[in-house]
């Protein structure tokens, strides 16, 4: 583990509460995985406890083992297993049982499969939408090795938001990400979704992995040029001694600056930026929900999301 002492602003309350327990039991009963648990997300207690609504969880599809080995990620690598054909229906059933009106789906990378899992991902989206079309579905997808026909399968399934994380600036892609990933490849996925659909696009950047400010600025510009609508920025935290060291703990005020730059200068519809923000951060979901479901203006949706996140 990094020898750097974590600053006070990174300390979180442990997860608890009846809502948290109910969601955990439902997931266990249906043999489902969440990225919240597998990636040791620090916001799990906040999201699952439903502080600002019915609660949310990010379902991780296609198993709990990834075909790639990114140096920041706590998900296990290798030992890939066959897909569970019942998983799409089980996820949809759990969404209904928990009572979610906004669900996030992500997955491990499955480079071992012919379609890299795109068909399985699309079936899960359709299962949820067929049961209740009013549920908003956000998907955080792999890069599918840049194969646009596989990205198109996701688009055709009709999610409300498609996210794909660029993770870090161009110079730090290696050693941060697996060598099969890449800056330009991730940009091309996001650009394709923007060009071929009206679906909202979203991405995430980790800070504290050795990047410089001018590189973050450049990355924001590249993302906006690709048509990305929503961006989140958060602090990288080292999951274990075997993972990438933390280069720097970025002060909350710097995150506030990046939020202003992203929205006011580059014109992102929304930017959630803070030390504990993650790609599926709830404030971002609240923004999208307010725009898509309630028809609020971008400015009003921003205010509502930030007010809820600060309460």
Swiss-Prot record:
For this protein, the record's Pfam families field holds: LIAS_N, Radical_SAM
Key word Transferase present in the record? Answer: yes
What SUPFAM superfamilies does UniProt report for this protein, alphabetically? Radical SAM enzymes
Record field: catalytic activity: [[Fe-S] cluster scaffold protein carrying a second [4Fe-4S](2+) cluster] + N(6)-octanoyl-L-lysyl-[protein] + 2 oxidized [2Fe-2S]-[ferredoxin] + 2 S-adenosyl-L-methionine + 4 H(+) = [[Fe-S] cluster scaffold protein] + N(6)-[(R)-dihydrolipoyl]-L-lysyl-[protein] + 4 Fe(3+) + 2 hydrogen sulfide + 2 5'-deoxyadenosine + 2 L-methionine + 2 reduced [2Fe-2S]-[ferredoxin]
Enzyme class at the top of the EC tree: transferase
The entry's localization annotation reads: Cytoplasm
Q: Which residues bind [4Fe-4S] cluster 2?
A: 66, 70, 73
Leader sequence residues? none
Q: Which residues bind [4Fe-4S] cluster 1?
A: 36, 41, 47, 280
Starting at the broadest rank, the lineage of the source organism is: Archaea, Methanobacteriati, Methanobacteriota, Stenosarchaea group, Halobacteria
Q: Which InterPro entries match?
A: Aldolase_TIM, Elp3/MiaA/NifB-like_rSAM, LIAS_N, Lipoyl_synth, rSAM
Carries keyword Transit peptide?
no
Its name, as the record gives it, is: Lipoyl synthase
